[in-house]
Amino acid sequence: MNKIWLILASIILSFNAVATQITDGKQYKTLDKSVAGEPQVLEFFSFNCPHCYQFEQVFHISDHVKKELPDGIHLTKYHVEFLEPMGKYLTQAWAVAMALGIEDKISVPLFEGIQKTQTIKTDADIRKVFIDAGVKPEEYDAAWNSFVVKSLVAQQEKAVADLQLQGVPAMYVNGKYIVNMQGMDISSMDVFVQQYVETIKFLIDKK
């Protein structure tokens, strides 16, 4: 995983994308056991993960995927709690963002505060991010303790266990396939991103 990100970080952008055949074992892998009931396109990440920061905020791969998804299909993002510090707290905070429908407002400041400025170190710092994003303090506190948020936390934890997640960032399709970044063409960033997106689209249509 580290190697792929070091290479991607050194790539000069190129606009000469090349179509590539998508095959099992290369751009994606079929899970040994499929998991029913998961979102059709599911990304796992952690605000504590430097590679997730690059994936989201530097290369904007998730944004490219979202733009290219067919109508009616959405990208769902789950936070993992196995990366510290505050892994479990950040997962619950992400559940609050999901419940309030403000994931896009929260994602950037949390990533920046943890990975770049290192100004987020406590639960109070996380709470302040929500308040700065326009959430009333009492609304945040109520959501934090709500049944909906607790259910979303459990949902994220269950998906991690059911899919036997090994690391982040990771993207799954239909509970059957995981995208394999190590098998992507990394001759340029544009080629890599295009192939990543095309792999997702291919897997959505795959029976």
Give the positions of each predicted feature:
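Acidic/histidine-rich, surface-exposed loop or edge segments in extracytoplasmic proteins
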Residues: 42-47, 91, 179-184
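Structural alpha/beta surface segment adjacent to cysteine/selenocysteine redox centers
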Residues: 47, 53-127
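Extracytoplasmic thiol/disulfide redox context detector
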Residues: 3-84, 199-207
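Short, flexible active-site loop motifs that bind/organize anionic cofactors or intermediates
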Residues: 42, 116, 130, 139
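C-terminal cap of thioredoxin/glutaredoxin-like
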Residues: 133-207
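Solvent-exposed, polar/charged alpha-helical surfaces in well-ordered, non-transmembrane soluble domains
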Residues: 63, 91, 95, 108, ...
